[in-house]
Amino acid sequence: MRTPYNPNQIPRVIIIQKLYGKFFNEDENLTFPKHRFKKFIKDVVNGTIERNDLITEELETHLKEDLILTRLDKLFQVIVKCAVFELLYKPKTSSKIIIKEYLNASNF
């Protein structure tokens, strides 16, 4: 019998939660849970924070003129920024996997 999914244990859900707290709740205390993918989670969270301005610039160059990133849903902003970070700075992971997993994480 398969164990049920616990969305709080899925790495990209954890990444989204941490970054949402950092960007929108001004959560300065970034602690990372014990997890088998802890290094990956920390890399993506810290990398997205460090490169936030570059990621935002990149996104804004691809948005239509009537779309402003800061006017989009906050959760959507975080998901897109995480995905863009991975697509640009984690080339070992297939883009199909990155997109699929962030789409799955957005369903939780």
Q: How would you name each of these model-derived features?
A:
Residues 1-108:
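N-terminal interaction/assembly modules
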